[in-house]
Swiss-Prot record:
<comment type="function">
    <text>The antigen 85 proteins (FbpA, FbpB, FbpC) are responsible for the high affinity of mycobacteria for fibronectin, a large adhesive glycoprotein, which facilitates the attachment of M.tuberculosis to murine alveolar macrophages (AMs). They also help to maintain the integrity of the cell wall by catalyzing the transfer of mycolic acids to cell wall arabinogalactan and through the synthesis of alpha,alpha-trehalose dimycolate (TDM, cord factor).</text>
</comment>
<feature type="active site">
    <location>
        <position position="302"/>
    </location>
</feature>
<dbReference type="InterPro" id="IPR029058">
    <property type="entry name" value="AB_hydrolase_fold"/>
</dbReference>
<feature type="region of interest" description="Fibronectin-binding">
    <location>
        <begin position="98"/>
        <end position="108"/>
    </location>
</feature>
<feature type="active site" description="Nucleophile">
    <location>
        <position position="166"/>
    </location>
</feature>
<feature type="binding site">
    <location>
        <begin position="302"/>
        <end position="304"/>
    </location>
    <ligand>
        <name>substrate</name>
    </ligand>
</feature>
<feature type="binding site">
    <location>
        <begin position="82"/>
        <end position="83"/>
    </location>
    <ligand>
        <name>substrate</name>
    </ligand>
</feature>
<dbReference type="GO" id="GO:0005576">
    <property type="term" value="C:extracellular region"/>
</dbReference>
<keyword id="KW-1015">Disulfide bond</keyword>
<dbReference type="Pfam" id="PF00756">
    <property type="entry name" value="Esterase"/>
</dbReference>
<feature type="binding site">
    <location>
        <position position="279"/>
    </location>
    <ligand>
        <name>substrate</name>
    </ligand>
</feature>
<feature type="signal peptide">
    <location>
        <begin position="1"/>
        <end position="40"/>
    </location>
</feature>
<feature type="disulfide bond">
    <location>
        <begin position="127"/>
        <end position="132"/>
    </location>
</feature>
<keyword id="KW-0012">Acyltransferase</keyword>
<dbReference type="GO" id="GO:0050348">
    <property type="term" value="F:trehalose O-mycolyltransferase activity"/>
</dbReference>
<feature type="binding site">
    <location>
        <position position="194"/>
    </location>
    <ligand>
        <name>substrate</name>
    </ligand>
</feature>
<feature type="active site">
    <location>
        <position position="270"/>
    </location>
</feature>
Length: 330
């Protein structure tokens, strides 16, 4: 009887947490993102190019910010968050990523746009407050863009990295699962790593509705659709272990440090996604994984100050794993 009572109480606690998240999460995501700066962060003089890359899948040219690491260099694809803008990638708006990686031997690739996309190939048109468009981001990132970059910029098609924050952290992992030759390295910073489970689909739908008016059903169908499982990193740990993919996972504990991010939305969101990261670590270790960095012990909130610090910290690891030759690219 005691065991049953404990289970009932535990179920009740999960229900209350889920209900609270359903009420607060969409608005908090909007607040945590903060107001974007008017201009990008990269200083004048850096060799940053603004490419218009044709996408047959999406029926338009896609803007891509690009800094070369030299001919034949490996690349780091930096993916944006839920509220990705159409002018600059969030990594350039909020961090000096191009400065940090200048002459690192790594080409830096920042696709622009894709609000609420999860960088996925959607089942249906992505219709939001700004109208409808076609989202075939996985096809773009794994076929159209690498072909363009290999032909026009001398970037390697294989042996690259994908790094994402929040929404796109899980996207980076799934890109590595499904395209292991292209992405031998995946970085996930403050992401929800079990999106298909529990209230995940409902909460993601609410957040997408708040961030542009998009519908999760148009992306992956109802929660029972296999696409949700296909895009759930926690269900693909055996593939990541089998491919020996290099992983870099970060999630703070919701307590701000001297870096900043001391606001309730950023603190709540980091706490909210933390448990999925800890579970992922346990499952990864249990599956025999041995090629990952887990940075879960430090203070940190759901904000760019911490994601930028992680990107800067992982640079030597990226260079070593991808075989970069520092000094290239200008």
């Amino acid at each position: 009887m005691t065991d049953l009572s404990e289970k009932v109480r535990a179920w009740g606690r999960r229900l209350l947490v889920g209900a609270a998240a359903a009420v607060t999460l969409p608005g908090l995501i909007g607040l945590a993102g903060g107001a974007a700066t008017a201009n990008a962060f990269s200083r004048p003089g850096l060799p940053v190019e603004y490419l218009q890359v044709p996408s047959a899948g999406m029926g338009r040219d896609i803007k891509v910010q690009f800094q070369s690491g030299g001919n034949g260099s490996p690349a780091v694809y930096l993916l944006d968050g839920l509220r990705a803008q159409d002018d600059y990638n969030g990594w350039d708006i909020n961090t000096p990523a191009f400065e940090w990686y200048y002459q690192s031997g790594l080409s830096v690739i920042m696709p622009v746009g894709g609000q609420s996309s999860f960088y996925a190939d959607w089942y249906q048109p992505a219709c939001g407050k700004a109208g409808c468009s076609t989202y075939k981001w996985e096809t773009f990132l794994t076929s159209e863009l690498p072909s363009y970059l290999a032909s026009n910029k001398g970037v390697k098609r294989t042996g690259n990295a994908a790094v994402g924050i929040s929404m796109s952290g899980s996207s980076a992992m799934i890109l590595a699962v499904n395209h292991p030759d292209q992405f031998i390295y995946a970085g996930s910073l403050s992401a929800l790593l079990d999106p298909s489970q529990g209230m995940g689909p409902s909460l993601i739908g609410l957040a997408m509705g708040d961030a542009g008016g998009y519908k999760a059903d148009a992306m992956w169908g109802p929660s029972s659709d296999p696409a949700w499982q296909r895009n759930d990193p926690s269900l693909h740990i055996p593939e990541l272990v089998g491919h020996n993919t290099r992983l870099w996972l970060y999630c703070g504990n919701g307590t701000p440090s001297e870096l900043g991010g001391a606001n309730m939305p950023a603190e709540f969101l980091e706490n909210f996604v933390r448990s999925s990261n800890l579970k992922f670590q346990d499952a990864y270790n249990g599956a025999g994984g041995h090629n990952a960095v887990f940075n879960f012990n430090a203070n940190g909130t759901h904000s760019w100050e911490y994601w930028g610090a992680q990107l800067n910290a992982m640079k030597p690891d990226l260079q070593g794993t991808l075989g970069a030759s520092p000094g290239g690219g200008g």
